[in-house]
Amino acid sequence: MRVDLFDFDLPPENIALRPASPRDSARMLLVEGSEGALADRHVSDLPGLLRVGDCLVFNDTRVIPAQLEGRRGEARIGATLHKREGLRQWRAFVRNAKRVRTGDRIDFGAGVSAIAAERGEDGSILLDFEGDEPVELLLERAGTMPLPPYIAGKRPTDDRDRDDYQTMFAREKGAVAAPTAALHFTPRLMEALAAAGIASETLTLHVGAGTFLPVKADDTDDHRMHAEWGRIDAATADHLNAIRAAGGRVIAVGTTSLRLLESATGEDGVIRPFDGDTAIFITPGYRFRAIDGLMTNFHLPKSTLFMLVSALMGRDRMQAAYAHAIAEGYRFYSYGDSSLLLPG
């Protein structure tokens, strides 16, 4: 399909630079049924919009401070880590990468440095961090939260982002982007969901910086996704299969949860344990096997994520839903409002 079929105009004022407070006060657009009926709600309404026996699936990845600023000699170098490849090695997208040669040492300050070990075909650079201290501790000292370009380009990252850009479920360190749909959840909301008979489960998918990259191809067939590591354990898979067998719905919270669930599910509709990389790319025409609904934020024009929601609900319906959201002043992207997509 042509990538420009997934384009739309978004006014800059619709881009959120800070999250709602409290988190569950964010607005939520309900898109429901084969006709894509729309209703303006709030995230706090979620317990009344789901059914007894449904299950929400959250991504428990934890964002690391993966944005680094350093120098190679006099040249300023910016690096965004996006995938771990060894005990001390991370693949990174590097600003001013042409100034970095294999074997160069980059000083990131605070006693943190790395050697440019190799250059990848995608233009990324493999960084080999020096010293014996765990890389996670080095990043805590020298790194900042890797906010998406559409936020970082409008304001500097600050200490608030260390909390704001982390979900309440964040446990497994390794993501360089937040699973943002889950940013809306609070302990109060989780208690209300449990009281309404709605279950929850977690899986892990370490979101990579590739999620921020634009689609450069003109046709979806020519686009290649970056691989991300994920895991679903046997107990979680068994529980989700039991939920569906009993007539409940599996609702993915975020596109990362959805993509991993679909990667772990066979043609028979059975969710299986998963431990490995996925580069699944979902576009219209895909047959969903694992999920019955999706809660997700509002995505970029011509992005792989807008293609995914178009696959779930239909491109025309999602174009209409986004036009409604823009007209009604919904806040877009990582710190923005939410949508609940129930194809019916």
From Swiss-Prot:
Q: What is its EC number?
A: 2.4.99.17
Q: Which UniProt keywords apply?
A: Cytoplasm, Queuosine biosynthesis, S-adenosyl-L-methionine, Transferase
Give the reaction(s) catalysed.
7-aminomethyl-7-carbaguanosine(34) in tRNA + S-adenosyl-L-methionine = epoxyqueuosine(34) in tRNA + adenine + L-methionine + 2 H(+)
GO BP annotations of the record are: queuosine biosynthetic process; tRNA wobble guanine modification
Q: GO terms for CC?
A: cytoplasm
The family note in this entry says: Belongs to the QueA family.
What PANTHER family does UniProt report for this protein, alphabetically? S-ADENOSYLMETHIONINE:TRNA RIBOSYLTRANSFERASE-ISOMERASE
Name assigned to this protein = S-adenosylmethionine:tRNA ribosyltransferase-isomerase
The scientific name of the source species is: Rhizorhabdus wittichii (strain DSM 6014 / CCUG 31198 / JCM 15750 / NBRC 105917 / EY 4224 / RW1) (Sphingomonas wittichii)
